Every structure is written in structure tokens, then in C-alpha cells.
């Protein structure tokens, strides 16, 4: 098969389809093939399932290539309709349920939307995640330095090095209360750790970035300005990294990492307990 030939990939669920997407993407990332993804959540009725089956079959007829179909469907009748399509179907949950049933000696009690839905059993975890998101938004970009005793991590770094997206990902994905504080150009003449942060040194974590990458990012926001110049970026990165070393603040170069990787590395380095939702 030509790796440049685009394959259609379906992620189908009678719930949010998050499980199908995550596991499907993980599997597809192992293959050097171009894909076009179609995510179909809440396929909960026979009529909808029949329409999805027809969509898969039509694509197969048009392209001559079987669409790749990852499903996470609890309802048997809905699942069977999709499995009868012309797609190459992978039931990513049921393939694990059988062996686990044998090991546990228990029959599964499947319930739609249990994984990512709101139930009595996970309500407290959901509330904790919303509280973490609220906290992170209120402590983004140095907006407030109050309540830092409640932070689980405080990210530091120059402007546009990835502090805000990483903080939000930590809050939304793991329920981590993350504050972040920026060092700006005006700080560089006499860069030091703000007094409000010193009592929480054990919570501080630095993000840095290659100056060339930083300049490219800033050029998109403020083209041909001192703020976006390579010289200014080199100055700021150098000064901030020196501060991290002087203050013995652990830090990570974010240049070649995704937000997901940065957040996970922070959890590991800071020994923070992850809470999956």
C-alpha cells in the first residue's frame, strides 16, 4: 500500500467517543499512513447506526479501500449494526472485556457513558476538576498571586513558552490546580524571583524554549517588533534559565514536546498524583 494514500478512519461510540478516539489515534500513530478522521459520538439509536453503516459502506464503494473503524459501543444491537458494515472494524473495548471477564470471574455490567459521563459515582471527581479549572483560570499569567497555597504547581517562564496551555491541560485532564507566572521584557534588567513566590519554591516549575522557536511563535503574534526579535528572545531565555539555575528551580525545555507530553513530564518530575477523568 502507498503510504500517501489517504485512509478514512471512523471513531464511533454510543457515548462521547473519547475512548475510541484516544485508543484509535494511539494505534494509528504506529503507521506512516495519511488519514482522514471522522468522529461520531452518541450513536444511540438503530436509525443512527444504520445511517453510519451506510456512510461507511458508501466510502468503501467510492474508494475501494475499507474504512478503518474503531468503536466503543456498549449497546449490543447498535454495535452489531456497525460491525456488519464494510469497514475494517475494531471493537476496542470488547476485545479486552472477554479476557478480563475470565480473569476476574465476573460478568461485565456495561452502561453507556460510564467512562466519560457524569454519574453519582464520579460527581465528586467532576466537581474537583471544575474547581481546578476555575483556579487555573483565576491564576493564569500572573493575574493573581493570592491563594498560591492552594496551587499544586506554579509554572514560570517567558511569554509564549507554553505556560497557559500546559496549565489548562493539567487542570482539565488531571484536575491539577496550576498557577503560572510570566517573566516579561521589563523584568530582564534586574530579574529575580518575586517575593510572593518565594514561600512556595517547592511548587515552582520552569518552562523554557529554544530562542529560535520562541521568536517564530512571537512573530505570529507581533511581527517585526522588539518583543519578537531573535535577539530579545535569546536575552529573555538566557536570563530566565540563569534564574532557574540560581534558585534551583526544576525546569523543562518545551521546544520539542506537545502540551500533553509537557504536562505528563511535569506530573512525573513534581511527583504529582494524576487523576484521570
Curated annotation (Swiss-Prot):
Native organism taxonomy: Bacteria, Pseudomonadati, Pseudomonadota, Gammaproteobacteria, Enterobacterales
The alphabetical list of record keywords is: Kinase, Nucleotide-binding, Serine/threonine-protein kinase, Transferase
Q: What is its EC number?
A: 2.7.11.33, 2.7.4.28
Molecular function in Gene Ontology:
ADP binding; ATP binding; phosphotransferase activity, phosphate group as acceptor; protein serine/threonine kinase activity
Question: Is Amino-acid biosynthesis there in the keyword field?
Answer: no
NCBIfam families hit by this protein: PRK05339.1
Q: Which reaction does it catalyse?
A: [pyruvate, water dikinase] + ADP = [pyruvate, water dikinase]-phosphate + AMP + H(+); [pyruvate, water dikinase]-phosphate + phosphate + H(+) = [pyruvate, water dikinase] + diphosphate
The UniProt function text for this chain reads:
Bifunctional serine/threonine kinase and phosphorylase involved in the regulation of the phosphoenolpyruvate synthase (PEPS) by catalyzing its phosphorylation/dephosphorylation.
By what name is this protein known?
Answer: Putative phosphoenolpyruvate synthase regulatory protein
* Organism this protein belongs to: Erwinia tasmaniensis (strain DSM 17950 / CFBP 7177 / CIP 109463 / NCPPB 4357 / Et1/99)
Keyword Nucleotide-binding part of the UniProt annotation? yes
| Annotated binding of ADP, by residue | 157-164
In terms of domain of life, where is this protein from?
A: Bacteria
Amino acid at each position: 500500500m502507498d503510504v500517501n494514500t489517504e485512509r478514512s478512519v471512523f471513531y464511533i461510540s454510543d457515548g462521547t467517543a473519547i475512548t475510541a478516539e484516544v485508543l484509535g489515534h494511539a494505534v494509528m500513530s504506529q503507521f506512516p499512513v495519511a488519514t482522514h478522521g471522522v468522529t461520531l459520538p452518541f450513536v444511540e439509536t438503530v436509525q443512527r447506526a444504520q445511517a453510519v453503516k451506510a456512510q461507511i459502506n458508501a466510502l468503501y464503494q467510492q474508494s475501494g479501500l475499507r474504512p478503518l473503524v474503531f468503536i466503543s459501543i456498549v449497546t449490543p444491537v447498535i454495535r452489531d449494526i456497525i460491525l456488519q458494515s464494510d469497514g475494517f472494524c475494531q471493537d476496542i473495548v470488547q476485545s479486552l472485556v472477554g479476557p478480563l471477564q475470565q480473569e476476574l470471574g465476573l460478568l461485565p455490567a456495561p452502561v453507556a457513558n460510564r467512562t466519560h459521563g457524569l454519574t453519582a459515582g464520579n460527581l465528586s471527581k467532576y466537581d474537583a476538576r471544575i474547581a481546578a479549572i476555575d483556579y487555573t483560570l483565576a491564576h493564569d499569567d500572573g493575574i493573581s498571586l493570592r491563594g498560591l497555597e492552594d496551587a499544586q504547581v506554579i509554572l514560570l517562564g517567558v511569554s509564549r513558552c507554553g505556560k497557559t496551555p500546559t496549565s489548562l491541560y493539567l487542570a482539565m485532564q488531571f484536575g491539577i490546580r496550576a498557577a503560572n507566572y510570566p517573566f516579561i521584557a521589563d523584568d530582564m534588567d534586574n530579574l529575580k524571583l518575586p517575593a510572593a513566590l518565594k514561600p512556595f519554591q517547592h511548587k515552582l516549575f520552569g518552562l523554557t524554549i529554544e530562542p529560535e522557536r520562541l521568536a517564530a511563535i512571537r512573530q505570529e503574534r507581533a511581527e517585526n517588533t522588539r518583543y519578537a526579535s531573535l535577539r530579545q528572545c535569546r536575552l529573555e531565555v538566557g536570563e530566565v534559565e540563569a534564574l532557574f539555575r540560581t534558585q534551583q528551580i526544576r525546569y523543562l525545555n518545551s521546544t520539542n514536546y506537545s502540551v500533553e507530553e509537557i504536562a505528563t513530564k511535569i506530573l512525573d518530575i513534581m511527583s504529582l498524583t494524576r487523576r484521570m477523568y
